[in-house]
Amino acid sequence: MLKSRSLGLAAIAGTLLLTGILAAQTSSPRDTWQFTVSGDSRNCGDVVMPAIAADIMSHHPAFYWHLGDFRATYTFDEDYTHQPEHAGRTLSISEYLGTEWQDFLDNQIAPFGTLPVFLGIGNHETIPPRTREEYIAEFAEWLDAPAIRAQRHRDNPRDFRLRTYYHWRERNVDFINLDNSTLDQFDAEQMLWFERLLERDQADGSVATIVVGMHEALPDSIANDHSMSESLPGLFSGRRAYQDLLYAVIHGHKLVYVLASHSHFYMENIFNTDYLSQHGGVLPGWIIGTAGAVRYDLPSKATRGPGARTNVYGYLLATVNADGTIHFEFRNLEETSVPAAIAARYKPEFVHWCWDQNSQAPKQP
């Protein structure tokens, strides 16, 4: 484990605020570029994800990153049962399991066209009978995408193994996709890989920023009850990963941003808790589980407002400045955002159901 030392909340917040101000003063639109992120697209993802793709294309981002939970797996997704070819039929679970991942690719990933898409693994991708090994086989094309394969071979020319965790470089930013889809993660092998990567990044002057994405949020966030804290291996390894990232900020002088989904709402500044402010500092963090899954109520400790919203669908639009600072904006999508062809295929009544009824959270006045 990398050695970590304490850094107060005010120091980290002040540093990030200062760098954000400087970026706004010194970066021109020509110096910036964008990427997009969201996760959790079961239930209504076949309707919501095409809307996300259509909105994303207007920004011309470098890529889209899905943080996991493509399909429900344990039961039929509502969008699956409302497809015309399934209407009025009694579906079998074997038929569903045999087609659910292809359904995801056909209806949720195909709308992105030639835009690079990076896939993270969620807990629903490992619900029995699904396994991590089956996931690797099914999504090998994405896990061995050109950017990932090139980076893996730069790290080790003899490494041809596909993994559910990986990283790739875009300009001066290192993007790290971690796997915490099962309760035993992060295991020793993944932690060793992660910490060695952070060590290399800290020694590399060409890396200004580290963006870490995963399905479940690291422990001790505002959304702690639905995070890596749900298992002891997750709690211990997640806290260790958090301290490793703090070390990269304090001693490596890197900018660090942490992204997760799993909770089906939008929330920013998720690590602004008493525990973390007293145990090293608060990293910038977001939850963006808003790509179609049944919406959850916000945690009791969350302050409702622009930075914490439920009963919404959308994605994060990230704008990267030349110095590596990143501005994240939540792009909220309305029912009218659904492409006409998708609304016609699923019928307006079901599209409205997705926006109005696909929720376990109370409606706000």
PLM feature segments, named:
Residues M1-A11:
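Bacterial N-terminal signal peptides that target proteins for export
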Residues A10-G20:
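Bacterial N-terminal signal peptides
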Residues A24-E95:
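N-terminal active-site segment of His-dependent metallophosphoesterases
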Residues F35-V37, Y64-H66, L119-G120, V212, ...:
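Residue-level marker for buried hydrophobic side chains located in beta-strands
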Residues D40, G68-D69, G122-N123, H215, ...:
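Active-site glycine-centered loops adjacent to acidic/histidine catalytic or metal-binding residues
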Residues E78-S206, I210, M228-A241, L245-H251, ...:
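Extended active-site neighborhood of metal-dependent phosphoesterases/phosphodiesterases
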Residues E216-G234:
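Active-site His/acidic residue clusters
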Residues R304-P365:
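A short C-terminal boundary segment appended to hydrolase-like catalytic domains
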